[in-house]
Regions:
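P-loop NTP-binding core
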Residues: 1-208
Length: 208
């Protein structure tokens, strides 16, 4: 839907899933074409500019959905820039360790610089919310708990109250390319499974 040559309607890209009211516009290697074609499109001054294309594609189906989630890789490509321009809320996941926080800080500084350049070409950078989600969290890990406290002291209400726990149940379910909602609870340690599901449900409810 964001292609420069022969774009298809966004509704033709979206697929139903096994989960009620949850649809999917799957990413894939085809999106690499956008990264390669955008420099040429910029050189030729094609319209609309790259940072508007994803937002325009989503606008086609905006009335059909309450929330559209765009999952971006931790890289500053044209697709990530497009997603940040299309977004109304930004959720940043962060592992509470010194190295990960330092890496996030550097990444966000680079992102801010690039977004300022994009904004100079007319992109809108107004967000309703910008939140941090502490992920892969181990409450019994003292250093992690300290870093989580540091993040909350630094960003206050911008840090989500609930955390996404680190759990072997999540990684084990991933081995079969399933979510915890799809696997059989009996195949896991029940306490481990229940803690992981509770964590996911709490984060999801807070996001809602």
């Amino acid at each position: 839907a964001s292609r420069y040559e022969g774009p298809v309607p966004m509704r033709d890209v979206i697929r139903k899933t096994y989960f009620p009211n949850l649809d999917l516009a799957a990413a894939g290697i085809v999106l690499a074409e956008f990264e390669h074609e955008t420099p040429r499109a910029l050189h030729e001054r094609r319209e609309p500019m790259f940072f508007k294309r994803l937002g325009l594609a989503i606008d086609q189906v905006e009335a059909d959905y309450d929330i559209v989630v765009i999952d971006c890789p931790p890289q500053l490509g044209f697709l990530t820039m497009s997603a940040l321009i299309a977004a109304t809320t930004v959720l940043i996941t962060v592992i509470p360790s010194m190295l990960d926080i330092a890496s996030m800080n550097q990444f966000l500084q680079m992102t801010a610089g690039l977004l300022n350049v994009v904004a100079s070409y007319g992109a809108s950078l107004e967000y309703d919310n910008l939140k941090f989600l502490i992920t892969r969290f181990e409450p019994s890990d003292g250093p992690q708990a300290q870093m989580a406290g540091f993040l909350r002291a630094l960003f206050a209400e911008q840090v989500m109250t609930n955390t996404f726990l680190k759990s072997t149940a999540v990684s084990d379910a991933g081995l079969t390319q399933q979510t915890l909602y799809e696997v059989d609870r009996s195949e896991f340690n029940r306490n481990t499974y229940d803690r992981a599901v509770e964590s996911i449900n709490q984060v999801s409810s807070e996001l809602e």
